[in-house]
Amino acid sequence: AHGALEASLRSVTSGHSGVALFVDPNLITTAYVTQALESISTGVVSGVFTDIHENPCEADVLAAAAFLAPLNADCVVAIGGGSTIDTAKMALLLAFGGGVPKDWWPVHRHDPVDAPRLYVYPATAGTGSEVQSHALISDDKTHRKMAIGHERLAPTEAILDVSLLASCPRRVMVLAGIDALSHALESAVTRTATDVSTAAAMDAFALIWPALVELASQDRILTAPACEQLHAGEHSGRRQDAGRCIGLQSAPVIIERIG
């Protein structure tokens, strides 16, 4: 629902003694996010990481892991787009699983990682990272993309609050929508696709196309198509992850608060 961030943050952080926050630097100064963060109980937040870069590389996530490791956090919260969420995911995996990114790629490892719960609040509509057990980062030298997968990268909950999209530039929203379309296409044509995943990918196409067309034709973000694109981005993200990871036992709990 609109304005779900503040109440949701209070709920997911209650009962925790150390909350690590990963927040998009463009969001941390907005009144909406600032007010929500201030609502968290005093003394609960262990640290706030805002050194988020678009399309994070190995050095970026190693820095994030170095931030997280000494905090003794029992809860991790990410507020932002796909880059923020992927940075938080990799920080969690490296801080609690050890090693460097290439230790976890390209083989999809299944060794247990005892890590805190991860709650994510996507601020763009299309990356699908909020519902995937993968994080996409770049090689420092070659810039090659690495899709690192592990069951602990699947968020515990993804909370969809359309109010977070208000600060997102329309161009970014449109590009995120195109990203979501590409996820649906990948899901439909992958060799591991099933009848169910293909049908769901087509549903994602049907959801996102009219919303994307409307967003692209306007000079501002409209609530209705933004909601549809947020929903479709999450939907196609799940299908893309299913195509990559048939047989994974864990899946995130999704709270679809759209309306």
Q: Can you annotate each of these PLM segments?
A:
Residues 21, 57, 82, 122, ...:
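Buried hydrophobic positions in well-ordered alpha/beta secondary-structure cores of metabolic enzymes
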